[in-house]
Amino acid sequence: FGLANLARRRSLSLIQATSLALSFTALMLLAIVGPGLLDTWRRELPPDTPNHFLINLQPEQAAAVATRLDALGARQLNTLPLAVGKLLAINGKTPRAEDFSDRRAAGWINGETRLSWSEALPPANRLVEGHWFGAAAATPEASVDRLWVDMFHLKLGDTLTLGVGEQRIEARITSVREVDWSSFRVNFFLLLDPASARSLPHSVLASFHLPRGHAADLAALSRDYPNLSLIDVDAILDRVRDARR
């Protein structure tokens, strides 16, 4: 249950890295300075801050799982599709790690790119340049996090070519976002317009807030959907705090 389950599924651990790594890095940094600051930080978070994540949810399961979570009293349920692909070109040119001073660029260029799509601007995202996706974009559009803009020297109007499974998509950057990675919501560096992306092979990531006392209910959910991996943030924080006392 939780991180132990993820550890047994290396591929799932890799899949969830983009959405959760920055949040959990922040947690670990807080843990280093001691449980007092950690407890203070927890009290300052909004009461309905997401404290659970579901990983590897299949599209055909999403509605039924959401209904069960709603029956348990889950709040702030946020789901986004997750596709795994590769960044093939920027403005028609194959990117090379040595062309960028930011060392993190190599990971994106040589590894996988995890992306999503959404009709509306997701929670914990703020539009800082450009416009959000139209109802029916004539050509594929992309929205990138500011980190990508800085790392790859991107600007509005640039094109990104992506390979996802057997599909290839070339999207024009129409907006730049600033993401609150400490929000404990499902977030992505790269979002595509839904009309262009919804046919891509994908799973679903979900975040939600559920009060304590539902461990048995969540265990039952995991048994009924054995492909799911559940991360209980409260349990992780408790263990971090206890380990530091």
Regions inferred by a protein language model and the residue ranges of each:
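Alpha-helical transmembrane segments of bacterial inner-membrane membrane proteins
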Residues: F1-R245
